[in-house]
């Protein structure tokens, strides 16, 4: 119920808690969406440049969870957890993302996939619980740059998938 109320809020109500990142990816929404659905895909592109991802468990369904570790280029490991709150194939994915299932600082993200000719415009809209948490994510964890790099990695991976599908 709380997330529905937040989402229904006006843009100005969340502007100081929100990060929005978008990119046009040269592939159809169905293929871009597919890259989120399985470990074999996610482990190839998830995270900023220089990071790798190890999945402990993944259940891609509404209410399902993804428990994983992001390995930073400096050797630091970051435990991560996502619960999928809404999935509309090739259109929308909503999630709660934190360090663990009980993380009081978990944040909400919504990804939308919009057809743009033969390409897809993906938008990642993240809302933090407080403006201070958004600021910390931007300054300490470089959330904007990391998000842009993650979508760049997704674009490169999906281009490889599209090329392989074209050959097959």
Feature locations, PLM:
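Hydrophobic ligand-binding cavity/cleft-lining segments
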Residues: 1-52
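Short beta-edge strand/loop motif at the mouth of beta-sheet-based domains
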Residues: 20-21, 40-77, 165-168
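A short, structured loop/turn motif at beta-sheet edges
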Residues: 29-30, 61, 85-91, 112-121
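Hydrophobic pocket/interface hotspot
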Residues: 32, 42, 66-68, 84, ...
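Beta-strand/loop substructures that line and gate deep hydrophobic ligand-binding cavities in soluble
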Residues: 96-148
């Amino acid at each position: 119920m709380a997330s529905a109320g937040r989402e229904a809020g006006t843009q100005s109500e969340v502007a100081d808690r929100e990060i929005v990142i978008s990119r046009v990816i040269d592939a159809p929404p169905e293929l871009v969406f597919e890259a989120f659905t399985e470990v074999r895909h996610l482990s190839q592109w998830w995270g900023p440049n220089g990071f790798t991802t190890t999945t402990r468990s993944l259940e891609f369904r509404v209410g399902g969870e993804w428990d994983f570790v992001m390995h930073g280029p400096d050797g630091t490991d970051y435990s991560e957890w996502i619960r999928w709150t809404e999935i509309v194939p090739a259109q929308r994915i909503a999630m709660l993302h934190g360090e663990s299932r009980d993380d009081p600082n978990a944040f909400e993200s919504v990804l939308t996939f919009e057809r743009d000719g033969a390409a897809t415009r993906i938008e990642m809209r993240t809302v933090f619980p407080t403006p201070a948490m958004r600021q910390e994510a931007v300054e300490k964890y470089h959330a904007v740059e990391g998000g842009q790099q993650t979508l760049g990695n997704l674009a490169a991976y999906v281009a490889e998938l599209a090329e392989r599908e074209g050959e097959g």
